[in-house]
């Protein structure tokens, strides 16, 4: 699926009432269409993995396009530089969590990024560290306990963090 086709689909599925509801849950309503997650998943399934498309979607700055970018990107093509660029763009908890859950947790650098991002001050960058811990623990069925116990000091420190969305994610871990 081409970038223009995806954007047209998102525009056609726009729901202004959903945008109002999203704003009540702390989601930035700027550049947001209010497209449901099931619809985003369907578009991602139709699009398949496409690193180039993911880059275009992310660059659009559209809320749902960024979530979709995390769904269609190829984890094998993602670099540490891309992870840094995207994490700096996170402006809501749902984009952060969805990108971590659908893409970043499958990138070999995920564990390294946990330690780097947990030390940062930006709210959603720090939250991404804890979202990654949760995703790795949930989805990685092959690693042993030692793979996850290395994150315990990060979790303990984050559980007392005053940053609201980080605090929430640390308690969810």
Indicate where each model-derived feature is located.
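Residue-level detector of extended alpha-helical repeat arrays and alpha-solenoid scaffolds
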Residues: 66, 96-97, 126
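Hydrophobic core positions within HEAT/HEAT-like alpha-solenoid repeats
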Residues: 70, 100-101, 130
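Conserved small/polar residues in nucleotide/adenosyl-binding loops
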Residues: 166-167, 171-173
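Amphipathic alpha-helical scaffolding segments comprising HEAT/armadillo-like alpha-solenoid repeats
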Residues: 48-56, 77-85, 108-116, 142-156
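N-terminal alpha-helical scaffold/docking segments in eukaryotic complex subunits
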Residues: 1-60
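HEAT-repeat alpha-solenoid elements in large eukaryotic scaffold proteins
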Residues: 127-133
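Short coil turns that connect the paired helices of HEAT/ARM alpha-solenoid repeats
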Residues: 59-60, 89-90, 119-121, 160-164
């Amino acid at each position: 699926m081409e970038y223009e086709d995806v954007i047209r689909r998102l525009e056609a599925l726009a729901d202004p009432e959903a945008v109002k509801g999203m704003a009540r849950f702390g989601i930035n309503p700027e550049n947001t269409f209010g497209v449901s997650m099931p619809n985003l998943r369907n578009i991602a399934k139709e699009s398949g993995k496409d690193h180039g498309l993911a880059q275009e979607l992310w660059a659009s700055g559209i809320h749902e396009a960024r979530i979709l970018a995390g769904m269609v990107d190829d984890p094998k093509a993602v670099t540490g530089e891309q992870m840094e660029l995207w994490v700096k763009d996170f402006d809501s908890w749902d984009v952060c969590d969805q990108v971590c859950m659908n893409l970043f947790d499958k990138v070999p650098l995920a564990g390294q990024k946990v330690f780097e991002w947990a030390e940062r001050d930006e709210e959603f960058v720090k939250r991404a560290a804890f979202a990654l811990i949760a995703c790795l623990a949930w989805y990685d069925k092959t690693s042993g306990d030692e793979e996850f116990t290395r994150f315990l000091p990060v979790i303990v420190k984050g559980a007392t963090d005053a940053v609201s969305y980080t605090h929430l994610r640390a308690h969810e871990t």
